[in-house]
């Protein structure tokens, strides 16, 4: 009498969705999607682009959804929730997944990953070179995660993925093409410092003359000396100076917010009747 054959169930290989949130990213979206073409799904969530972003994304084979803007955190959580697979790689439109990083992620997902989230270094291309000094590097980002055990958190700026349990680390870099030029950097810093000041103001932070005097030079020294910006010559000097400028703007805008709030709460003088 022959015994019945024994079948062993092989563990399933997790599939991956790459999510990208966009608005008017026609300049970047094709390269971003192409760098993620190896994934099982590329999902683009767009919020009202008026350029060719949607047409390019569709032509590149991405799944495209449209949704009104609700903030970085909510938009990224929405993208993760609408993805087809539980494992998510959150990619910004101005970022690229180079082949070494793609291979590392695929190898990790070939077996059941031991962690529910992974962070990785990000390298930024700015002013004609890859910058591996200042606060630009290694700029660790948690981007690969299991949505069943992780969510995006934060308010206006500095959103991040909160993972239930320890976070693993990937070795290869994510590429970041953040600014076209210095003019673009100044415009973006103006926007982000407004959001940062608002976030600090709502958290009860206050700013005074000492903050404007102390924090900007400290930011410059941290970037130029401690983070070795001097090794990148004029590029490192410029980035360090821009970091100081951004910190000054943030605290100046915070001071302006609290000053405006005080003025609005002051009793109004009434004309005599």
What are these regions (language model features)?
Residues 15-17:
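Cell-envelope/extracellular polymer assembly enzymes that use nucleotide-activated donors
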Residues 35, 46-55, 92:
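A conserved acidic beta->alpha catalytic loop
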Residues 27-30, 51-60, 100-101:
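Acidic helix N-cap motif at the loop->helix transition within catalytic regions
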Residues 7-8:
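Aromatic (phenylalanine/tyrosine) cluster motif
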Residues 74-81, 86-89, 98-261, 272:
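Catalytic-site signature of metal-activated, phosphate-bearing donor transferases
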Residues 20-38:
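Short, well-formed alpha-helical segments that are part of the catalytic scaffolds
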Residues 45, 67, 89-93:
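Catalytic metal- and UDP-sugar-binding loop of GT-A-like glycosyltransferases, i.e.
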């Amino acid at each position: 009498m022959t015994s019945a054959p024994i079948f062993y169930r092989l563990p399933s290989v997790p599939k991956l969705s790459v999510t990208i949130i966009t608005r008017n990213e026609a300049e970047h979206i094709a390269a971003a999607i192409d760098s993620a073409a190896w994934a099982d799904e590329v999902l683009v969530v767009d919020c009202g682009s008026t350029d060719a972003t949607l047409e390019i994304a569709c032509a590149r084979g991405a799944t495209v959804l449209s949704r009104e803007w609700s903030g970085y955190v909510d938009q990224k959580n929405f993208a993760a929730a609408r993805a087809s697979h539980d494992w998510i790689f959150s990619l910004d439109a101005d970022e690229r997944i180079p082949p070494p990083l793609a291979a590392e992620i695929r190898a990790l997902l070939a077996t059941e990953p031991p962690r529910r989230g992974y962070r990785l270094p990000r390298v930024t291309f700015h002013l004609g070179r890859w910058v591996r000094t200042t606060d630009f590097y290694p700029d660790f980002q948690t981007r690969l995660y299991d949505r069943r055990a992780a969510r995006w958190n934060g308010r206006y700026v500095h959103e991040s993925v909160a993972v239930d349990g320890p976070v693993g680390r990937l070795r290869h870099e994510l590429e970041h093409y953040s600014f076209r030029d210095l003019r673009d950097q100044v415009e973006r810093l103006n926007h982000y410092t407004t959001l940062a000041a608002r976030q600090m103001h709502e958290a009860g932070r206050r700013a005074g003359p000492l903050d404007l005097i102390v924090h900007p030079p400290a930011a410059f020294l941290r970037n130029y000396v401690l983070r070795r910006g001097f090794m990148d010559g004029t590029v490192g000097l410029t980035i360090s100076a821009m970091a100081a400028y951004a910190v000054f703007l943030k605290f100046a805008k915070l001071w302006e917010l609290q000053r405006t709030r005080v003025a609005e709460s002051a009793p109004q003088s009434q004309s005599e009747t």
